[in-house]
Amino acid sequence: MAPTRRSRDLLRGKNVLIIGGTSGIGFAVAQLVIEHGAMACIAGSNPTKLGKALDALKQHPDRDPIAIVQSATCDLFDVPNLEQNLDNLLKLAAGDSKIHHIVFTAADMVQPPPLASVTIEQIQRVGTIRFTAPMLVAKLLPKYMELCPENSYTLTSGSHAKQPDPGWSLVTGYCGGVEGLMRGLAVDMMPLRVNVVSPGAVLTPVLRDILGDSLEIALDAARKKSTTGRIARPEDVAEAYLYIMKDQNITGTVLETSAGMLLR
């Protein structure tokens, strides 16, 4: 009987692209990836944040000695050049070989506008990063990734898709759209595995910026709504993405990591 590979070895030497890997959940995924001996390419639109994230990953104390880290700037709001920007990103991440896993965590994390005042421009802007960009990645990735069950493409939605909060219709709509897109891609791109991670409340730097003085009130409400009584950290949720990369039997699935908030 052939020896069983350790779970930690399943990502060793693999090439992982994290789009939105400069902070929050995406950055936490990158940390886990390099702890497992994989090459991580993080992509973001802000060169300053990208540089700081790259330096932090290179200095990560638990980084496996064989892990390689690189970064790439990619403006997901540059609609006229979006497809070319993404193609350039995928080409850079693939290098002389192929990409094995792609994680898409990028999002326009701002307080959504009230329904009564939402504009076409705002609808399109949110849709560009949450729906259009992930779909274009799917269109382009066969040039840079082998479509096989060992590889994966993981998108991100949110608990809003199943349990909307007042005033979040714009984000709720696209979260649901991403989950539908994932199912379509899982069929169109088989046997490549395509899945979605759906986080609940996660305490990220961006969330702190959005909520400002209302942060503690919002966190207290989220704790009471959950069954665990706690708010997730990015590193908690990042484990869901690692699981999807490793489990070659999971595809077409929304993996909820929401502290039981959907139960109440």
UniProtKB/Swiss-Prot annotation:
**Keywords, sorted A to Z:** Glycoprotein, Membrane, NADP, Oxidoreductase, Transmembrane, Transmembrane helix
Show the catalytic activity.
Answer: 1-hydroxy-3-{[2-(1,1-dimethylallyl)-indol-3-yl]methyl}-6H,7H,8H-5lambda(5)-pyrrolo[1,2-a]pyrazine + NADPH + H(+) = 1-hydroxy-3-{[2-(1,1-dimethylallyl)-indol-3-yl]methyl}-4H,6H,7H,8H-pyrrolo[1,2-a]pyrazine + NADP(+); 1-hydroxy-3-{[2-(1,1-dimethylallyl)-indol-3-yl]methyl}-4H,6H,7H,8H-pyrrolo[1,2-a]pyrazine = (+)-premalbrancheamide
Q: Which residues are glycosylated?
A: N249
Query: Where does it mainly reside?
Result: membrane
One Gene Ontology molecular-function label: oxidoreductase activity
The residues listed in the UniProt record as binding NADP(+), with positions renumbered to this chain, are T22, S23, I25, S45, N46, K49, D75, N88, R130, V202, T204
Which positions are tagged coiled coil? none
Q: Which GO terms describe its cellular component?
A: membrane
Give the highest taxon in the source lineage.
Answer: Eukaryota
Family of the protein in this entry: Belongs to the short-chain dehydrogenases/reductases (SDR) family.
Name this protein carries in UniProt = Short-chain dehydrogenase/reductase malC
Q: Which organism is it from?
A: Malbranchea aurantiaca
Q: Which gene encodes it?
A: malC
